């Protein structure tokens, strides 16, 4: 029944295809029933790249099963003949797991050389998107990385950047710009844009950069263990974390340079990291001290997402923008302990760990924060609740796969995040001003006069008779929640409250009324509630 609802993580195939679709000369054959190759539509809709997804399906049909035959060998032959990939990854499905088919034996009967095939054997019932992607990438690194001499000059690998990654290309551009300013070359970016030959060159770099907790960190740990390659796992999101990240990177590079007897690299002037090369690298430090942003110290924020972005955004909102964090959570249970450790001292209560979007929506509805940083799921939930929301991580939609330069990494990314926080919280004022001063003919909302002009609507009762439904002008209006009624005067006063906090004010006022034993919110009760709640 869970499939009837939205899910935060995709299937194992989703994770496998994110790796193979990122790479050159790598193809995926999915052994599954017809229709399970729907994932190709996701890439063509969101990825915005000229290449068609490298994914084919080996159809499992009832007739074939009855005859005791499989289409997998012939599908592998067709893929090898038509696409000529360097590697074909064979992915199991829930159907093949139930049928207990031996994919290795079926692949061996295809006649395709074994070195060009990889059966990624996992349990599709237990493994989901991120774990499958991280596991496959690590498997490929183990298979193809070859120990070799280091590059003569400082170089790094950028690991974990995958197809459908959040602001993928912009983040890569931001990292490349900072590395270029430091005088550090990029040896390999993987899996994005890499081939089998590139994976073989991974050990030539001086160190690995794996900023995503979800994908790439396991491969970096393997290279550290087997090839003695140090790794950096921090994500440079925010001004302070980026500054610390640059210092740590330079320290690591200079330590290795010292062992090699090479000259040390120096930290360039801050303006070297700016877009124009002349100004400060980020506007966040001064922007956070402006009158507009200082008012954010009273705003309450809730953050929910994957491990990497949840940790980064909580720290950015509190440390750099001064917002109050009322809660945070992640849908990745396997990384929950790491998130708890990183956010120790940042949260007023327990970390929310759930993969049910309904639980997150209920928390938002109960707390009514001033800003939600979450996924596409939270964007939908917040739209119903009139709560400002910005998307910070997958799952995403088309507006988070942009052609323009909107990174989250580095100093440039700090500016992008600050802009989105500010605009998400402030743009609602425009609608409030229209509500308050009138629409000036824009017809933004249905006017009260039009509502009053509507004729009484006939309502059919339980016996089939028609009655006229009227509400007298002075009769209190019952609230949908809790049975508390509101007088016309109190409703008029409530309409003067900005729409983006109106629901929260209504709820708090009704709670206050119940607390003092009132069953109807009058103008006097509304004023008392306002005074009591500090309004």
UniProtKB/Swiss-Prot annotation:
The keyword Iron applies. [4Fe-4S] cluster binds at residue 36. Pfam families: Oxidored_nitro, PCP_red. Its EC number is 1.3.7.7. Keywords: 4Fe-4S, ATP-binding, Bacteriochlorophyll biosynthesis, Chlorophyll biosynthesis, Iron, Iron-sulfur, Metal-binding, Nucleotide-binding, Oxidoreductase, Photosynthesis. HAMAP family: ChlB_BchB (MF_00353). Belongs to the ChlB/BchB/BchZ family. This is Light-independent protochlorophyllide reductase subunit B. The lineage of its organism: Bacteria, Pseudomonadati, Chlorobiota, Chlorobiia, Chlorobiales. The gene is bchB.
């Amino acid at each position: 029944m869970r499939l009837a609802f939205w899910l935060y993580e995709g299937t194992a195939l989703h994770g496998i295809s994110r790796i193979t679709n990122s790479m050159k000369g790598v193809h995926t054959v999915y052994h599954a029933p017809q229709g399970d190759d729907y994932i190709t539509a996701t890439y063509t809709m969101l990825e915005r790249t000229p290449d068609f997804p490298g994914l084919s399906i080996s159809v499992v049909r009832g007739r074939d099963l009855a005859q005791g035959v499989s289409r997998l060998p012939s599908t592998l032959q067709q893929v090898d003949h038509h696409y000529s990939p360097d590697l074909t990854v064979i992915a199991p499905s829930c159907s093949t797991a139930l049928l207990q088919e031996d994919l290795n034996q079926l692949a061996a009967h295809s006649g395709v050389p074994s070195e060009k095939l990889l059966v990624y054997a996992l349990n599709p019932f237990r493994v989901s998107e991120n774990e499958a992607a991280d596991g496959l990438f690590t498997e490929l690194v183990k298979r193809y990385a070859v120990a070799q001499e280091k590059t003569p000059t400082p170089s790094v690998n950028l690991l974990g950047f995958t197809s459908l990654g959040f602001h993928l290309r912009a983040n890569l551009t931001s990292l490349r710009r900072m590395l270029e300013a430091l005088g550090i070359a990029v040896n390999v970016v993987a899996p994005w844009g890499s081939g089998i030959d590139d994976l073989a060159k991974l050990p030539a770099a001086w160190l690995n950069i794996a900023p995503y907790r979800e994908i790439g960190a396991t491969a970096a740990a393997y290279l550290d263990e087997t090839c003695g390659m140090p790794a950096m796992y921090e994500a440079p999101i925010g001004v302070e974390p980026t500054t610390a990240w640059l210092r740590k990177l330079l320290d690591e590079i200079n330590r290795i340079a010292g062992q090699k007897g090479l000259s040390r690299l120096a930290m360039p002037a801050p303006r070297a990291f700016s877009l124009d090369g002349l100004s400060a690298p980020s506007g966040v430090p001064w922007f956070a001290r402006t009158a507009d942003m200082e008012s954010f110290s009273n705003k309450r924020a809730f953050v929910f997402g994957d491990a990497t972005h949840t940790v980064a955004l909580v720290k950015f909102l509190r440390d750099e923008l001064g917002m109050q964090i009322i809660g945070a959570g992640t849908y990745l249970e396997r990384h929950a302990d790491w998130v708890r450790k990183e956010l120790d001292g940042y949260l007023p209560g327990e970390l929310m760990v759930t993969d049910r979007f309904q639980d997150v929506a209920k928390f938002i509805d109960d707390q009514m924060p001033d800003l939600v940083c979450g996924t596409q799921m939270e964007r939908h939930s917040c739209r119903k609740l009139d709560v400002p929301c910005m998307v910070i991580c997958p799952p995403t939609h088309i507006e988070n796969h942009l052609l323009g330069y909107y990174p989250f990494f580095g100093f440039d990314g700090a500016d992008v995040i600050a802009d989105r926080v500010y605009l998400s919280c402030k743009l609602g004022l425009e609608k409030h001003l229209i509500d308050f001063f009138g629409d000036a003919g824009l017809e933004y909302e249905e006017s009260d006069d039009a509502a009053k002009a509507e004729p009484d609507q006939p309502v059919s009762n339980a016996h089939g008779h028609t009655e006229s439904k009227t509400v007298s002008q002075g009769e209190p209006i019952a609230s949908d929640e809790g049975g508390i009624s509101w007088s016309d005067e109190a409703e008029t006063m409530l309409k003067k409250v900005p729409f983006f906090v109106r629901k929260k004010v209504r709820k708090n006022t009704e709670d206050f009324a119940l607390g003092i034993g009132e069953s109807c919110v009058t103008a006097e009760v509304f004023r008392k509630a306002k005074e009591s709640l500090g309004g």
